[in-house]
Amino acid sequence: MSQPADINQSESSAETITQGRRADRPEETPSSSVYEQNLRFGDFLMPTVGDADATDSLSQSTNDRDIYSPREIDQYTRKVSSRTDPSTSTISNARQHPRNSVSRLSRSSSNVRQQRDIPKQNFKVRPLSPLRGQSPASLRSEESFTLKERQNAINKTRAFGMRLWKPALYKKFRSINRDADIDIHDEPLKRPNTSISNVIWLICFGAPLFLVIFICYIFFTVLSFFNVPDAIVYSKLCRGLMFYLLYPFGQHVRHKVKRLSVRSPAHPIYQTQHSHYDETPTSHHPDPARLNFLSFSFCVNPMNQSLDCNTTPHRRNASSIIYTLMYYLIIAPTLLITSAICMFTIFFVPCARTLWAICRHLRTCPLSLSFRPNLALPLSMDSSDVVLLCVKKAASWKYYKYTIDGIYIIYFDMLALIIPTIFFGFFGSQGHWFTSSVFLFTASLVSIIPLAYFIGMAVASISAQSSMGMGAFINAFFGSVIEVFLYSVALRKGNAGLVEGSVIGSILAGLLLMPGLSMCAGAIRKKFQFFNIKSAGATSTMLLFAVLGAFAPTMLFRIYGPFRLDCEPCGANCQKCTKHYVLENDSLYKNRVLPFTYCCSIMLVLAYAIGLWFTLRTHASHIWQNFTADDISFLKAEEEVGEPVNQDTAGNMSDSSEGGEAVVNGNSQHHHNRDDASSGLSSNGSENESLEHEPTNELPQRPLVNQSQNSHGDDAPNWSRSKSAIILLSATFLYSLIAEILVEHVDTVLDKFAISEKFLGLTLFALVPNTTEFMNAISFALNENIALSMEIGSAYALQVCLLQIPCLMGYSLFQYYRSGDSISFKHLFTMVFPTWDMICVMICVFLLTYVHSEGKSNYFKGSILVLAYLVSMLGFTFFNY
């Protein structure tokens, strides 16, 4: 099996359009070139240099070449060819240039969006043969699963104490990333779209960039009058650059390529090009490096190979030195700042990537670049230029789904707010708007969202790559440590009401708001969804015990505790009295209730430990070791089809739609759009011995992950364990600093807006840190997996009751005895809640239990849960004593 070609990532490399392939040995050279393979399968992929996901995707496309039979390839080729409309494609515009081989590109260029219709077979896992020192049972353990399968297994089984996570933890080439590559490597023959985003670019970004580069152009023009060597060359470069940056749509960037010899069949460009010009390559062949862009720019770009920037001589003279200074002082900072601004706007991703690519090439090989309008095409056969970049639109709404290293771009953009907030919060001087309490409070609250997401991603990544015991421990510790630290800081500042409201608000959000919104969101795609009633029953049992343990001290104190009557006259012979429970200087609370709260806290932690023990010792073998081939096929079918697959032993549970490959389940075959070019099949040499492609729909044996770890695909994580650990610790440290700033300015905000600290805890402090959980729950529901959505809310409510409340009691106990029994109750978490809080939580648990008992969700039930949450919040608003 051929291996991916080494991509030259040196300074002389350019922005690539597609990934080439190279055979390891002459005898392993494929019979047909990768150009033809990509052409036939419609894999119109345009990765950037160093983009691992893109390299993985193209590597998989070549693996698919070996899976499909010649008959299937021929059928798909005819199918795609029949869809090409000569009246709308660019082929009719270039038929007058037959040497350009445009007709061969019809299936790659005009059918880019149709590449998802590729038929794909489903395979079954064959029994693993035991290796030396290993039993068949050990081979079926968790080490034999890819990371994708392990994540799906964790989500499907919903093991107690494990982190449920919707975004892919493995390397996955997403359709939005492929579209982003296409948008900056579009067909120069197509006319640009006249859109409002292009006008916004012209006014907001193009004009300022034009003025900055115009200064450099004037300077080099003046130098050219004094006959400074190469000044006129740099002047032309700046002139083309400033007009391109003013309005890049309808123009393209060219790059000169050094002429290469094609006499050697071992040359990478020769290997990927020769079969498309002549059946028998000869020395009369034209130089592939000099062919115009229409022959290879959209499939095999020579920039992907070792692009030589010495085509244009680069002499060290006064002009080059001046240009270098201008580049680092003026051009590069301007382009990079503008690129960052475009990236922060989320929707201007094509412009941001274009500016980044131009900035790189202006540093390495500026004189090899040229900027031309699209009317200058096609290129002549003797031209050594190739098309590097071609952008048709400045922005698109779809880029809110764009990912960087597996993280959505919106979370990366929000990271830019963290460091300034910490700096202004600790070192900023008063008197400025950016050091005001309102600004720092708002900025700190927003900064919590990306930090919580990164912590959740790191915890899920470590859990999926480690044993279940380690994953459960990491989730239990870091899943609650950030909230516990925030609450501890608030208690130290004397905001016990804020902590009390945050705890109640988190429970209500997990029991009502999160499942309610998930049901309403899931009804958008499917009116009814079903889940396993037995699994939901176990969760309901845990919730009932958690509520009993958390609110038992409150019930006993309300029944047996003393109270105080505060009366005021209402007339001549009447008084209006209000009953208040006071904990200070109360002997019943000190001698009876307080020890009882410590016992309840121990019981809550013990219940969590028993649940983990049951999961690790009982469910672990069921989840990992006893997974049969049918279970794995069921997981794949659920994940690839994106719909629940009927199976007697699996209940009504279905997994998320991570991908969209068509599968074969039983005797019925379902074809769906293909979202993702990655697959579980790998091409490592160590796997070839255990892989068998047979027409009996059997999946080749997958090797042990720890023995043959792929560098891409389902086996390769987005974050390694060491990287996840570093991110986890760093995000936790930053979260602690943000929590200090947030609590420091709470009192000022409360005084300015006249709201109670408990209501602030019920709303902002309870909802904002849980934004990641809401995102995961709604994403699962949209992918027709409402069971996981409801499990996320219940699991978080259990974590609050079973872990966070005992931790707060432990912190209060430490503060109570350290202060010598003289500390105020404003600095303690008493575990004695108001009566309305207790009644609300209990009713909500019974309401959710009733919804669980039916095993069916729809927008009606979701709306009822959301309305119940709103009623509870209104009660806290109008009767918050």
Swiss-Prot record:
Protein topology in the membrane: Multi-pass membrane protein
InterPro entries in the record: CaH_exchang, NaCa_Exmemb, NCX_ion-bd_dom_sf, YccF
Composition bias, Polar residues: 1-19, 83-95, 646-657
Annotated region (Disordered), positions in chain: 1-39, 52-142, 641-717
Family annotation (Gene3D superfamilies): NCX, central ion-binding region
Disulfide bridge partners, by residue number: none
Principal localisation: endoplasmic reticulum
Transmembrane segments annotated in the record for this chain: 200-220, 329-349, 407-427, 438-458, 471-491, 504-524, 537-557, 594-614, 726-746, 762-782, 794-814, 828-848, 859-879
Biased composition (Low complexity): 99-113, 678-688
Matching Pfam families: Na_Ca_ex, YccF
Entry's family note: Belongs to the Ca(2+):cation antiporter (CaCA) (TC 2.A.19) family.
Protein name in UniProt: Putative cation exchanger C521.04c
Source organism of this protein record: Schizosaccharomyces pombe (strain 972 / ATCC 24843) (Fission yeast)
